[in-house]
Amino acid sequence: ALEPRFATEPGLVVISPATPGSNGITRAFRERAGRHYVDTGIAEEHAVAFASGIARAGGRPVLATSATFFQRTFDQLQQELSLNGTPVTLLDFGGGLSGADNTHSGAFDIAMFGNIPGLTCLAPTSGRAFLDMLAWSTSQSNTSPVVIRVPGDTILNRERSGDLPGDAQDVTDMGSADDTCSNACSEKTTADGTATCPWSRYRTIRRGTTV
């Protein structure tokens, strides 16, 4: 999704704090990306500050790492991203109850990111939604920091299978997508009152703004 834009967007930079392999950043991609890819080493705090500097200079940086490692960057998320409002995109891998050990548990990502003022938090429920969100967050129309909770294999495998939830009798929605979900389901409601909203998503946004 990002690679085709490198030729025309010199400020589009992918950053990894020494976790490229576990975040889908292959060796082949890194070689093709050239200066559009930077590995900061095991220095997540520096990676966030570095990304904020790129964004402040007009670039569109994308920082990818595991949810558990973002915990080390809380100070930089507050001081570098929140206070400056820089349009950095954070790709949050392994969020929620994931991983097979305590070290790589991403259970605290929403609690942490949700307490960073001005940080837009998105959780796509499909691969397509993820790519759409990534395209928006790295575009010039976005002017603030964004974190995207990258969907895992369970979601992606279900999407590939085409097994969508249906035959719903009730619609449950929560958060700022409330009205949008309700309106969409209302328009699709059948004569017997059945409605389905299969691709609902969680997000937190700044008061008074819409995405």
Model regions and ranges:
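Hydrophobic transmembrane signal anchors and adjacent membrane-proximal interface regions, especially
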Residues: 4, 8, 64, 88, ...
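Sequence-pattern detector for short linear motifs
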Residues: 75, 152, 163, 204-210
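Acidic/proline-rich low-complexity IDRs
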Residues: 154, 163, 196-198
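Condensing-enzyme catalytic core mediating Claisen C-C bond formation in acyl metabolism
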Residues: 156-177
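N-terminal low-complexity segments that are often proline-rich with Ser/Thr-Pro
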Residues: 174, 178-211
